[in-house]
Amino acid sequence: SLCDKPHHNCIDGQTCYHTCCQNGLKCVRYP
């Protein structure tokens, strides 16, 4: 998976610096 370490809720499809959102979870991607 491109995502790891689920965090607080977020908007699906939202992305920013080394982060992504999937299934309402904010995830941190490996740099």
Curated annotation (Swiss-Prot):
MF-aspect GO terms: toxin activity
Primary location recorded for the protein, binned into one broad class: secreted
Sections of the chain in a coiled coil: none
Expressed in which tissues: Expressed by the venom duct.
Disulphide linkage map: none
Modified residues (4-hydroxyproline): P6, P31
Domain comment (free text): The cysteine framework is C-C-C-CC-C.
Protein name (record): Conotoxin Cltx-2
Organism: Californiconus californicus
